[in-house]
Amino acid sequence: YFKKLGIVIKGFLKRRRELKTIRQYDIVFIQREAFMLGSTWFERKYAKRSTIIFDYDDAIWLDLVSGHNRVFRFLKNPDKTGKIIRLSKLVFAGNQYLADYAAKFNQNVAIVPTTIDTAVYQPAYRTDKEKVCIGWSGSFSTIQHFETCLEALKIIKEKYGTVVYFK
């Protein structure tokens, strides 16, 4: 827990320093949130000093906390997402579901998909025997979502053997 506390303190100090220079920027992109705790204090300060574009690709307003972070639940504020969206000049949402939520607070919403549309972008056919890497881009606190894929990944590994590896 002390390691997480150190991360929070470092993040707070970094954001405080940024406030001094924020007027130098025409646009400030906020991805997810400016500070991990429940307050929108930093986002409100940023909005007074610059133009905010909010970019998100997860349903972060839902009150979901992993088992690892349950002790810190009281520090979270799911309503924060809507408040940040209201402060923003533009919102980039990763999909239609997120865009629909954002539209409740801000009409200037654009969908920027976080997944690749394989109907538009066709993978190149591979003729070589290189290994294929399958990666996970989640975090320790969202590992339960990854765990739902384990059976499928085992089947892939059984079928393709050493041609496939995981990161």
Please identify what each model-predicted range represents.
Residues 30-36:
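Short His-centered aromatic/hydrophobic patch
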Residues 1-5, 53-82, 117-119, 129-130, ...:
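Acceptor-binding helix/loop patch of EC 2.4 sugar-transfer enzymes
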Residues 52, 91, 109, 164-166:
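Hydrophobic/aromatic residues located in beta-strands of well-ordered beta-sheets
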Residues 112:
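Hydrophobic residues at beta-strand termini and immediately following loops
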Residues 11-25, 37-48, 54, 58-62, ...:
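Membrane-proximal helix-turn-helix segments that form the acceptor-binding/catalytic region
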Residues 32, 95-96:
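Helix N-cap/beta->alpha junction signal
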